[in-house]
């Protein structure tokens, strides 16, 4: 399993948090139960207040699984995925 950092951004007009159908669906999607069918583990998530930007720290078999999991977010905005490492891994290999 590999670690990934994901950023999703959308326009205010398309904010899923304000949509009475989409908001609850996305909450369920980022839950452990929602991520499990994709083989993804959510280690953390946060939204930048007022910026319509959502970050996730995910563990998954590969980037393709992350993109599949992030599909609903891609319907309302952009999705960027970066391979990542824990601080412990970086120190062990002595480089970022």
Walk through the language-model features, giving the residues of each.
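Short active-site oxyanion
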Residues: 53-55, 78
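Short hydrophobic/aromatic beta-strand micro-patches
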Residues: 57-59
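Conserved short beta-strand edge segments in small beta-sheet-based binding/regulatory domains
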Residues: 76-88
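Acidic-histidine catalytic/liganding microenvironments
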Residues: 37, 73-76
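A short local loop/turn or secondary-structure capping micro-motif enriched for an aromatic residue
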Residues: 14-15, 75-77
